[in-house]
Amino acid sequence: MNTTHVPEPHRTEQHAENQRHWRKILGIAPIVSIAFPATMYFISDEDSFEDSLFLRFITVLLPFSYSAVQYALLHTNWKSHNKPERILQSILYYTLNLLFLAFSIISILSIIAFTLAEWEDDDWENNNDPIIFSFILPSFTVPLTYLLSTSCCLVPGQIGFTDTGINVLVDILILLCSAGDLVPAFDEVKHCYYFAIISSILILIRLLREKLSPEKQSPPPTAPWRIAVFVLILISIVIAYALLAYLIMNADIFDNYSISFGKVERASFHQSPANKQLIS
């Protein structure tokens, strides 16, 4: 029986090449995950999202599948390479382990729930479900996932924010855009595409800088301000996914209930016993 022997250096080179290709795919994925849903909104008719289950599916698929894959990778790497030795390390280990797993599961459930829910298309001054799912949620969740995956070190004893130079400013602007993306969700939805465009441009700038002038060595992320930035990013992600979980739980997908921000609040108002008496 003949067996083909593959030299170990060749296997190592092939593995490194596969990793480079995978990093390239994940590198452009956040931009595509923001730009594709926005493109689907602009090329579709006003009532297309309400009538087409497939259109809703492909619109939410990329941003939430990107997040699901990234958090699954973070969960796998954190679980396999980090073993707690002390009580505080054990708390951190199991907390991040649970969070990454929860973020990945919520991302998958978001694809299902937001596809099956009806997307109502109101006028520009009110909440508009297609805009919320095409612009607001992708440009709110994807950049945060990108920052945690690329700008933070997740090694026990070295956990923190690792970027330097102009990338620090770019990352802070990305974080601010994600936070500002929620403002039009509760005010005027028509301004939300600005944040999606700005976030995509900032991520593109960061990717081009990494390609043209890569940093030779990242500084140790143990400085207090670097740990603070990491905590800020993580808290922002927790808030984002708590919001997603809230929207999923309020999505009555069997009755094709609309789950836009304002409609959830209006539905809660009308459903309370006291307000029913006032209305009657």
Curated annotation (Swiss-Prot):
Instruction: List the Pfam families hit by this protein, alphabetically.
Output: DUF2463
Family statement drawn from the similarity comment of this UniProt entry: Belongs to the UPF0328 family.
Official protein name in the record: UPF0328 protein ECU06_0020/ECU06_1700
